[in-house]
Amino acid sequence: MTRLLIAASGTGGHLFPALAVAEALPEDWQVRWLGVPDRLETQLVPARYSLFTVNAGGLQGSRLSKAVQLLLLLAAGVSVARLIRRERIQLVLSTGGYIAAPAILAARFCGVPTVLHEANAIPGRVTRLLGRFCGAVAVGLPAAAGRIPGSRPLMTGMPVRADFLQSQPCPAWVPEGRGPLLVVIGGSQGAVGLNRMVRAVLPPLLEQGCRVVHLTGRNDTEVGQVQHPLLVEQPFSDEIPGLLQHADLAVSRAGAGSLSELAVCGTPTILVPFPQAADQHQEANAACAAEQGGAVIVHQHEPEATVLQQTIQCLLGHRLGHPDADPSLLPSMREGMERLAIRDADQRLVDLLQSLLD
């Protein structure tokens, strides 16, 4: 029996890829999960795997705050080292979050190899600093490979949940009609700015027969400002795979998790990078999709959402019946997104883990 410790914490972008890998492991592997109290993993993980938590955070704020956080990091590392020895852990997999640093340092101290997966095109601070201490570093986007000092990253892609890889029906609650389906994914971070941009351009689209599903995120207070029979607004959906597979076009942030899901579904996308993302990594993620021809980038600061409106009208023009529209745009973008996709990313990471045992 192989004992694996998965260190993944915080957002869905860290957790869902790790869960996808865990589900792809051989049956004789035993998984222990390392996270942080009061984060998303405390809701998603315990039903499937044994969850252990330690207090960990980023080194941010004033000098005093950073000093306190550094002490907490060292204490967390000691706790993780004890866990590794007590549970006789043989391998560690980290997909990021605050827990990554103490997990990598503790594994190094205990002589246990770590696989670190970096999802974004611009690696985070932990990856840049600690990647050299890992047995292997994997990347989700090729642009990250040359930005991790002291390591030779392997391109594995970004694991997604199994239901994204299987054909799904269009959700029954999607508005009926012959018009194109536009899916907007607001996301949990920075959703307000994107949601306002989208609402500014919806009325003329709806009047032309465009069907719209707007996933606003949980913190949106402006739901209901635009009302129309062809518009559905809700915070979140468990049926995102079916939505993306049947969408003619999506509008989304450019987080690595969302981008990988859009790619495996082959969904033509307008990407609006979150402008406050660390190191502008969403801008770099979006550029990877645009280079493949699968996405168009629109920036949030564009005045009055004019560029967003023009872009949607251009891409959906043929489906909306505009006589001068180019019918090849969406099929070409769909092919571009499919080129970006790596559908066996979970198995590639499993193979990488197994290689460290040989």
Curated annotation (Swiss-Prot):
Q: Write down the species.
A: Parasynechococcus marenigrum (strain WH8102)
EC class: transferase
Identify the stretch annotated as signal peptide in this record.
none
Functional summary from the UniProt entry: Cell wall formation. Catalyzes the transfer of a GlcNAc subunit on undecaprenyl-pyrophosphoryl-MurNAc-pentapeptide (lipid intermediate I) to form undecaprenyl-pyrophosphoryl-MurNAc-(pentapeptide)GlcNAc (lipid intermediate II).
Keywords from UniProt, A to Z, are: Cell cycle, Cell division, Cell inner membrane, Cell membrane, Cell shape, Cell wall biogenesis/degradation, Glycosyltransferase, Membrane, Peptidoglycan synthesis, Transferase
Q: How does it sit in the membrane?
A: Peripheral membrane protein
Look up the record and name the pathway of this protein.
Cell wall biogenesis; peptidoglycan biosynthesis
Reactions that this protein is recorded to catalyse: di-trans,octa-cis-undecaprenyl diphospho-N-acetyl-alpha-D-muramoyl-L-alanyl-D-glutamyl-meso-2,6-diaminopimeloyl-D-alanyl-D-alanine + UDP-N-acetyl-alpha-D-glucosamine = di-trans,octa-cis-undecaprenyl diphospho-[N-acetyl-alpha-D-glucosaminyl-(1->4)]-N-acetyl-alpha-D-muramoyl-L-alanyl-D-glutamyl-meso-2,6-diaminopimeloyl-D-alanyl-D-alanine + UDP + H(+)
**Source organism phylogeny:** Bacteria, Bacillati, Cyanobacteriota, Cyanophyceae, Synechococcales
Q: Which InterPro entries match?
A: GlcNAc_MurG, Glyco_trans_28_C, GlycoTrans_28_N
Which HAMAP family does the record associate with it? Answer: MurG (MF_00033)
One Pfam family name from the record?
A: Glyco_tran_28_C
Protein name listed in UniProt: UDP-N-acetylglucosamine--N-acetylmuramyl-(pentapeptide) pyrophosphoryl-undecaprenol N-acetylglucosamine transferase
